[in-house]
Amino acid sequence: MIIIVRLAGEIGIKSPRSRKNFEHALINNIKNVIDVEEVSIDQGYIILNTKGDFSKLSKVFGIASFSPADVISFSKLQDIVDFVKNKYAEKVKGKKFAIRVRRVGKHNFTSLDAAKVIGSSLYPYSSGVDLENPEIEIHVDIRQDYAYVYDKVYEGARGLPIGTTGRTIVLFSGGFDSPIATWMMMKRGSSVTLLNFKLGGEVHKKIVLDEVKILSEWNSGHKIKVYFVNGIKVLSALAGVKRYIRVVVLKRIMYKTAELLAKKINAYSVTTGESLSQVSSQTMKNLFVTEYDINIPIFRPLIGFDKEEIIELSRKVGTYEYSSKLPEYCAISSKSTTSANLEEVLESEKQVNIEYEKLIDEAEVVEV
C-alpha cells in the first residue's frame, strides 16, 4: 500500500539543510510506529510503501495529513481519466462529488483542464458536482509522468518531529495541566524527561504512569523516562516554613531539582504546566519569585490557557480519564499568598535542608 505523507507546513519553509534534517527525523519516527517497506521523498511528500496499519500516523508530530493512494503512470491525460473512471464510477453513484487536481511539472494541460475532463467522465454516474460540500472528494496529484489518486485525507498531528528541538525536563504532577504541557512541548519537537515529586504514594505513581502511557502514543515510538522523587521527604523539610509562602518555596525546590537534572542529562530547559493566575502560586509576582536565580529557560506552554481549555485538550490527547482521578497534591496550603516577598522566600529557603543531588540519585526511574 502506498501512503502519501504531507509535511506540517512550517517544515516546508525551512532552509534546504534544515528541511532535510526534519524530513530525516520524521522518516525515522514514522518507521518507529508503522512497518515501512520502502520510503522516498517526492516534492514535499514522503511516500511510504507499507503493508501495516497506518492509522498510528495520526499521532506522529510533523505530519499535516496522510492518504492511502494509487500511483499510476501516464503518457497522456486520457490515461488518468480512464483510471479514475474505472475506479470511481461505481463509488459516485447517487452521490455528489468533486475533483481536486494539483499538478507539478510541464504538461500540455492545466490543473483546471484535468479536473474538467476527469469530472465529465464521472458526471453521468453521479448525482452531480458539489465543490463546496461533496459526498466524495477525489484527489489527483499529477507529477511529470505519474499521478497519485486518492479519496481519503486523514488529519495528522502537525507540529515538529519528536527529537528535533532538544530535550526538556517537565515538572509532572499528573493533574490536568502537566500532561498537556508535556504534549505541547512534544508537539514542538521536544524530547521529554518527566520529574515527579511523589506525594501520594503508589496511587499517585500509578496514575502518573497511566498518563505517561497515553503520552507515549504521541511520542513517535520513543521511550519516556520518569524520575520519581521522594516528595514526602521534601514536604517534611518544609515544616518550618510559614504556611503562606510554603507553596512558593516548594515550587522553587522543584525548579532547582529540575535544573540540576537538566544539567545531568543534557536537557536545555524546564517545562511546567503553570497557567497565569490559575492558582495563588501562579500569579505573575509569584512566578517571578519562584524562578528567581534559576539559570535555565522555563517554558510554560499553558500560560495563556484557562482550565476549561486545558481540560478540553486533555480529552483530545487522552489523559482526561486519569488526570480527573488525581488530587492536586501541590495544594499543600489553603492560605497561600498571591504576592510572595522575594527576600522572605529566599531567607526561608535557606532554612530548608534539601540535598538536591541526593534527591535525584535516590529517585526511582521508570521508562515507559
Curated annotation (Swiss-Prot):
Reactions that this protein is recorded to catalyse: [ThiI sulfur-carrier protein]-S-sulfanyl-L-cysteine + a uridine in tRNA + 2 reduced [2Fe-2S]-[ferredoxin] + ATP + H(+) = [ThiI sulfur-carrier protein]-L-cysteine + a 4-thiouridine in tRNA + 2 oxidized [2Fe-2S]-[ferredoxin] + AMP + diphosphate; [ThiS sulfur-carrier protein]-C-terminal Gly-Gly-AMP + S-sulfanyl-L-cysteinyl-[cysteine desulfurase] + AH2 = [ThiS sulfur-carrier protein]-C-terminal-Gly-aminoethanethioate + L-cysteinyl-[cysteine desulfurase] + A + AMP + 2 H(+)
Pathway membership: Cofactor biosynthesis; thiamine diphosphate biosynthesis
InterPro entries (alphabetical): Rossmann-like_a/b/a_fold, ThiI_AANH, ThiI_fer, ThiI_N, THUMP_dom, THUMP_ThiI, tRNA_STrfase, tRNA_sulfurtransferase_ThiI
Residues covered by the THUMP domain: 51-153
SMART domains, per database record: THUMP
GO biological process, any: tRNA 4-thiouridine biosynthesis
GO molecular function term, any single one: CCA tRNA nucleotidyltransferase activity
Subcellular location as annotated: Cytoplasm
UniProt similarity note: Belongs to the ThiI family.
Role noted for this protein: Catalyzes the ATP-dependent transfer of a sulfur to tRNA to produce 4-thiouridine in position 8 of tRNAs, which functions as a near-UV photosensor. Also catalyzes the transfer of sulfur to the sulfur carrier protein ThiS, forming ThiS-thiocarboxylate. This is a step in the synthesis of thiazole, in the thiamine biosynthesis pathway. The sulfur is donated as persulfide by IscS.
PANTHER family xref list: TRNA SULFURTRANSFERASE
HAMAP family xref list: ThiI
Protein name: Probable tRNA sulfurtransferase
Organism of origin: Sulfurisphaera tokodaii (strain DSM 16993 / JCM 10545 / NBRC 100140 / 7)
